[in-house]
Amino acid sequence: MLRKLFGLTPKPPTLPWEDRSKLSTITDEAGPSSALLVRDVEDADFEELVVRSDRLVVVDFWAEWCQPCTIMSAYTEWLVRDYGEQLLVVALDVDENPVTPAAYDIMGLPTLLFMHGGVEVDRQVGLLTYEELQAKVTTLLASAA
């Protein structure tokens, strides 16, 4: 939506880990059978996948034109690799899905929303280091247990 308003053109072709148009798959050393996913979520299925989840959920609000979002995308994939089934990581394209960002007052990108039991428990606006993100997730998982 913002891309259309401001006449922004899509960025050049992306590297495989930057392509957020599909489910993003990462694989650890054990091979393809242990593939883990960062799931793309839309306005229509946000409540079912995120709000009703019994796990800690990390929601990555991103946009194609947002360069820092590319870095955050890699971090969310690393979270899946490092924490596995302990949490659910989803990504929502704010240009294609404007209802959910408006409902949660998402004003800047990238934004990570941390939810547990349908309630927002934390929020990160802007970049941070992966180590800072790990510390935040570890603390939230401990308090959710």
What are these regions (language model features)?
Residues G108, L113-A145:
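Non-catalytic, surface beta->alpha helical segment in thiol-disulfide oxidoreductase systems
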Residues L37, W62, L88-V90:
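Conserved Rossmann-like nucleotide-binding pocket used by diverse enzymes
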Residues L87, L92-A103:
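Structural microenvironment flanking redox-active thiols in thiol-disulfide oxidoreductases
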Residues V38-V57:
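A short beta-strand-turn-helix
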Residues P68-Y83:
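Typically the conserved alpha-helix immediately C-terminal to a functionally engaged Cys/Sec
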Residues D54-V57, W62-W65, G108:
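Short pre-active-site segment immediately N-terminal to redox-active cysteine/selenocysteine motifs
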Residues V58-V59, V89, L112:
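Hydrophobic beta-strand anchors of alpha/beta hydrolase catalytic cores
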Residues M1-L36, A145:
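N-terminal targeting signals for export/organelle localization
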